[in-house]
């Protein structure tokens, strides 16, 4: 792999340590990427351990060939939202000792201009995690209604100027279609008056389009529920988030399943009965990268790790 597209796994030790790995356990890396976390998990497994990796990016599947000779490893081409289905097909539901999810876009995807994720590198306006299927960002922008674009920018990017940006995109696309990342990024930079310090004006819009094109939040919701369904008692869930939308989802998911079912006030219920509805417990407070890691990998600055443990049924 070229140095340009090298990838540093974020919170590597903390994430894998959070899994509390058993040498003969069965683990899932739901976001294989370029294999950094998988490699670290495998280094903790004995010869009877097993790691099932998942990724929908064809380039990640190609990168997984580095582990082709390791009988403990297998790769599945697909989205992590379907992890429960893959585990069920393998007959391993309820037997998984740990699930790892590293959400968001990877450095190689950002750095490869041809993938169309970055507003800093000119390339085709694509943004698909799996570039073999689905509509591209350019195709969506070409036909989306102004209201729909504004909703996506505000909902998935928390962009305050969502409506203004959507109107400007709609007006400009009548003259020239948006086919390149630079075209879209330059337009947003040109029409944005109050620019945030140390943040490109197109950051939020590009994030929003990427999330929408790849149904990322739906995939995360399905992956979290799927992880809960496949984990064995005392199995661990380690999740790295990179922006507030992702982290809120993970935080609320863990909190909801840690508190158990809500009971109407005054209704007599035994503590043991209430405990049965509690499916998770938070293992630690949210973890952020150390100063040393941030110096080595500035892209880790917004990452947050949350770890939870599956309670007995």
Curated annotation (Swiss-Prot):
It is found in: Cytoplasm. One of its GO terms (molecular function) is rRNA (cytosine-N4-)-methyltransferase activity. The keyword S-adenosyl-L-methionine applies. Keywords: Cytoplasm, Methyltransferase, rRNA processing, S-adenosyl-L-methionine, Transferase. Specifically methylates the N4 position of cytidine in position 1402 (C1402) of 16S rRNA. Its EC number is 2.1.1.199. The lineage of its organism: Bacteria, Pseudomonadati, Pseudomonadota, Gammaproteobacteria, Alteromonadales. One of its GO terms (cellular component) is cytoplasm. It catalyses: cytidine(1402) in 16S rRNA + S-adenosyl-L-methionine = N(4)-methylcytidine(1402) in 16S rRNA + S-adenosyl-L-homocysteine + H(+). Pfam families: Methyltransf_5. Belongs to the methyltransferase superfamily. RsmH family. HAMAP family: 16SrRNA_methyltr_H. Disulfide bonds: none annotated. S-adenosyl-L-methionine binds at residues 35-37, 55, 80, 102, 109. Its main location: cytoplasm. SUPFAM superfamilies: Putative methyltransferase TM0872, insert domain, S-adenosyl-L-methionine-dependent methyltransferases. It is an enzyme of class 2 (transferase). InterPro entries: RsmH, SAM-dep_MeTrfase_MraW_recog, SAM-dependent_MTases_sf. The keyword S-adenosyl-L-methionine applies. GO terms for biological process: rRNA base methylation. This is Ribosomal RNA small subunit methyltransferase H.
